[in-house]
Amino acid sequence: MARHLLLFDIGNTNVKVGIATEGTVLTSYALPTDGTQTGDGFGLALLDIMRHAGLGADDIDACVGSSVVPSLDPLLRHACERFLWRPLQLAHVDLPVPLENRYERPTEVGADRLVAAFAARRLYPDARALVSVDFGTATTFDCVDGDAYLGGLICPGVLSSAGALSSRTAKLPRVSLEVSEDMPVVGRSTTTSLNHGFIFGFAALAEGVTARLRKVLPEPLEVVATGGFARAVARVSDCFDHVRPDLLLEGLRLLYLESEQR
């Protein structure tokens, strides 16, 4: 029987829960990052997720996560231990990320950024340099040269920017972020103008930043897009070599497997 891993990307907007085998991430689910949730509430939600996937607690070999919300860590640890009988192993805390961290203050780097950079390094070994572009709550660019994490850039995120615009403008509709293959650059209504502004605006952000990074990072260099809006932006931009929406979950899977071999 295949070994299954339960993977957690604990972010500011959602807790992304992935189910993986040793070879691949099979599927993922999103739970809201809810400050009122309890450990038992998370545990019951995890059982529902596994039931939907046709799995039980006995099918899970390990729970592995990455967190940028420290207040949720003890709740999810409780959920895993009580309901799945497995400890939650957190990247950068319980599982070191095997990259040389060249940040001026290494502890300032979010575990999510390190794990995504590590995943890109392992998935694309032929590239000397890699840039991971994560379209999450923030839009982050993380750079790797060989086995060294160099740092990167943190820019506004798609959802946070859309939410800020909607909350400060009385007459503007909410942004839908819908993408079609033949969408024109120029919107002809307020709704399409907003939608196209965000899609093409963030595509231009990615193109501009990656073009600058290509001037300072060694070749061969490959750019990997990830996060919830990676596919939408990639449909209107050719600056990405790869699109891996579950890059961080893949990184957690690989991190755990490497730790088992040490």
From Swiss-Prot:
Chemical reaction(s) catalysed? (R)-pantothenate + ATP = (R)-4'-phosphopantothenate + ADP + H(+)
Binding residue positions for K(+): D134
| Intracellular or extracellular location(s) | Cytoplasm
Q: What is its main location?
A: cytoplasm
What does the note under cofactor report?
A monovalent cation. Ammonium or potassium.
According to its UniProt entry, the protein's GO biological process terms are: coenzyme A biosynthetic process
Q: Gene Ontology cellular component?
A: cytoplasm
Q: Where do the TM regions start and end?
A: none
Protein EC: 2.7.1.33
Q: Which UniProt keywords apply?
A: ATP-binding, Coenzyme A biosynthesis, Cytoplasm, Kinase, Metal-binding, Nucleotide-binding, Potassium, Transferase
Please give the pathway this protein is involved in. Cofactor biosynthesis; coenzyme A biosynthesis; CoA from (R)-pantothenate: step 1/5
Q: Required cofactors, per record? A: NH4(+); K(+)
> Gene3D superfamilies under this entry?
3.30.420.40
Using the UniProt record, name the top-level EC class of this enzyme in a single word: transferase
Q: Which GO terms describe its molecular function?
A: ATP binding; metal ion binding; pantothenate kinase activity
Query: Active site: which residues?
Result: D112 (proton acceptor)
List ligand-binding residues for substrate.
Answer: Y103, G110, A111, D112, R113, T190
Residues annotated to bind ATP: D9, I10, G11, N12, T13, N14, V15, K16, T137
Q: What's this protein's function?
A: Catalyzes the phosphorylation of pantothenate (Pan), the first step in CoA biosynthesis.
Its family remark reads:
Belongs to the type III pantothenate kinase family.
Q: How does it assemble?
A: Homodimer.
Query: What name goes with this protein?
Result: Type III pantothenate kinase
